[in-house]
C-alpha cells in the first residue's frame, strides 16, 4: 500500500534524517535535493520523480528517478555522465524530461559545478607545473660511528 506524498510530507516535515536546522533555517541533506531547501517540492525521497546534478571526478553526473519502477531500485534510477564543459541547456533538458519545474535549478547547479571543475583543473595544472620545477637536494649522510 502506498501513501500519498502529502501524507508522507506531513509525517516527516518536523522530524527526518535529512532535516538540518541551522540558526532557524531548515536545510535538507537529501541526496535528491538540488538546492538544499527543506520543502515538499524539493524532497527527492518523497516524490516519485526527481532529478539531481552532482560531480563525478571531473565530469557532471545527472541522476534521474522516473518513478516507473518504484519497487525496483536498480532500474528506478537512470544516470547520465557528461563532460564538465557541457552546456547547461543539455542538463536542463535531461532534467526537464522528468521534472520540468526543477530544470532551471538543475541548469544553474550544473553551470556552477562546471565552473568549479574548470577552476580546479587550472589549479591542478598550475600546481603540477610548479612542482616539476622544484628539485630536492639529497642531504649528506653522516657516516656511522662504531
UniProtKB/Swiss-Prot annotation:
<dbReference type="InterPro" id="IPR002672">
    <property type="entry name" value="Ribosomal_eL28"/>
</dbReference>
<dbReference type="GO" id="GO:0005840">
    <property type="term" value="C:ribosome"/>
</dbReference>
<dbReference type="GO" id="GO:1990904">
    <property type="term" value="C:ribonucleoprotein complex"/>
</dbReference>
<dbReference type="Pfam" id="PF01778">
    <property type="entry name" value="Ribosomal_L28e"/>
</dbReference>
<dbReference type="GO" id="GO:0003735">
    <property type="term" value="F:structural constituent of ribosome"/>
</dbReference>
<comment type="similarity">
    <text>Belongs to the eukaryotic ribosomal protein eL28 family.</text>
</comment>
<feature type="region of interest" description="Disordered">
    <location>
        <begin position="123"/>
        <end position="146"/>
    </location>
</feature>
<keyword id="KW-0687">Ribonucleoprotein</keyword>
<dbReference type="InterPro" id="IPR029004">
    <property type="entry name" value="Ribosomal_eL28/Mak16"/>
</dbReference>
<keyword id="KW-0689">Ribosomal protein</keyword>
<dbReference type="GO" id="GO:0006412">
    <property type="term" value="P:translation"/>
</dbReference>
<protein>
    <recommendedName>
        <fullName>Large ribosomal subunit protein eL28</fullName>
    </recommendedName>
</protein>
Amino acid at each position: 500500500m502506498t501513501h500519498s506524498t502529502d501524507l508522507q510530507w506531513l509525517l516527516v516535515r518536523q522530524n527526518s534524517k535529512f532535516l538540518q536546522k541551522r540558526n532557524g533555517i531548515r536545510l535538507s541533506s537529501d541526496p535528491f535535493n538540488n538546492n538544499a531547501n527543506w520543502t515538499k517540492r524539493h524532497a527527492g525521497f518523497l516524490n516519485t520523480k526527481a532529478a539531481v546534478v552532482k560531480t563525478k571526478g571531473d565530469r557532471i553526473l545527472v541522476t534521474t528517478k522516473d518513478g516507473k519502477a518504484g519497487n525496483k531500485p536498480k532500474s528506478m534510477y537512470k544516470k547520465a555522465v557528461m563532460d564538465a564543459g557541457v552546456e547547461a541547456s543539455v542538463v536542463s533538458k535531461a532534467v526537464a524530461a522528468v521534472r520540468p519545474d526543477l530544470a532551471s535549478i538543475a541548469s544553474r547547479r550544473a553551470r556552477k559545478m562546471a565552473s568549479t571543475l574548470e577552476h580546479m583543473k587550472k589549479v591542478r595544472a598550475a600546481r603540477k607545473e610548479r612542482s616539476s620545477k622544484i628539485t630536492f637536494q639529497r642531504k649528506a649522510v653522516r657516516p656511522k660511528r662504531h
